[in-house]
Amino acid sequence: MHLSIIIVNYNVKYFLEQCLYSVQKACEGIDTEIIVIDNNSTDGSKFFLEPSFLKVNFIWNNVNAGFAKANNQGLALAKGKYILFLNPDTILPEDCIKKCLHFFNLNNKIGALGIRMVDGSGNFLKESKRGFPSPATSLFKLFGLASLFPRSKTFAHYYLAHLSNTQNNEVDVLAGAFIMIPKTVLNDIGNFDERFFMYGEDIDLSFRIQKAGYKNYYFADSTIVHFKGESTKKESHKYVFLFYSAMNLFVKKHYDARKAGFIIIILQIAILLRAALSAIKNLFKKHILPILDVCIILTTFLGTVFFWSNYIKREVNYFSNILCIVIYFFIALFLLLTYYWWEYNKRDNPIQLIQSKVIAALVLLAIYFLLPQNISFLKGVLLFGILLPFVLMSIIKWLFNKVKYAETKNKTEEKQQTIIVAEEKEFIIILNLLQKTGLSKNVLGRIGNWNETSPPLGNIKQLPEIVKKYMVKEIIFCENGSSFKEIINTISILPQGVRNKFHTAGSNSIVGSDSKNLNGDYIIIV
């Protein structure tokens, strides 16, 4: 057995289906076994995949064992001279495996090989090549300095941004999405460390490879599609916790105790700061309208009080303790009433907006008339303090909905500007599918070989110009219309903003993902 391919799957059956078809094509003529370890998926992966891939060795776990442990399960079964650890949401070009194996033959000191990766839109994934996460490197990444100085050898060392992504290079760390390694090297350094549940296991493995005297190489002569990339959202608390917990484990394992303790303290402080900033950012992003409402209400009420005390009723001290309590009571009550009527829970309903504000204002005015006579001079303050924010908040909400509607409308219209890259037979199948799902309204036509019964808009080499000419926003690539290699090369030169989806001959789905930070989407072919 020359090659064993190990894939860990968790709830991405449609992506794995496309992956397996591409892997089978890439391994033609090579003595290969494919082992899939499923970490207790709940999406029906077993019943969907097993009938279509009879030669694949599936292992179905009863629990989510984690990435490292699942890979080790596959490794225990692997018989190949070389091992390829591969993510399920990838597509390989036809010559990828052969090129990688040939590269190993050129240098017997290569310990492991990573590869150039792009996302579903053809954008280079910078995690394809990385440096070791030293304390300084981790902090630069944590606080965003790597993003501010993307070409700096110092600040952007984590992603080795100073090295060209189109040239082969020796690197420190390979991405776990694609690692090819000789079985003899694994016998020498050991398997994945199962203490790493998610993140860090590839860093640890890469470190041990170098420590044993081998070299890690980034291979740019072939490019694969990795749909999700680092799919966990980088601003989420879960990502911050998992990533830097992995860094802590890495430091404890590979640094001496005294130095490790100091580094871990720094990392813990950095994690807390990053988590706090992330929480504030997410809170503001999620509750921007309520925050604006609070600011508007406070500003208008206090502005009204200031105006009234200086120009209308100068003899009244509106900032006395009792009056301040009354005013702030009305402010708080106004906010509570607005929230109670689901102002923020149903923020897309303009009728709900008016209803919540009107009811809140009426209730406050009713309460005002129940106030003692000796503070009736607050009438003007409360009246303007209620009506003015009501008007301002309504205008802001109307503008917010207007902008949101426009964005949604544009996205909907863009999705309909679709071209299908396929031969005539496959084009008809895809077109019928889109008609059933209501997505065929603006399918402009087919890209492929000339056919008198179904003349194409052009061939795949003309695709960039056709996209610009017709303002295409979505392309469905069918593998039988062109090779995976040609498709991957094409998406890398398409204009920005084009959404790509992929369909492999024989598969039952169309998959795609707009960027590395978004979950993928799919269409099922029935």
Tell me what each language-model feature is.
Residues 207-283:
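Active-site-adjacent helix/loop segment of glycosyltransferases
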Residues 91-127:
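Conserved donor NDP-sugar-binding/catalytic core segment of glycosyltransferases
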Residues 275-308, 343-348, 396-526:
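N-terminal hydrophobic signal-anchor/signal peptide
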Residues 22, 38-47, 63:
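A conserved acidic beta->alpha catalytic loop
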Residues 83:
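Short aromatic/hydrophobic "clamp" motif used to bind/position activated sugar donors
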Residues 60-78, 99, 461:
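Glycine-rich, basic loop-to-helix element that forms the pyrophosphate-binding segment
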Residues 132-171:
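Short, flexible, basic/aromatic active-site loop/helix in glycosyltransferases
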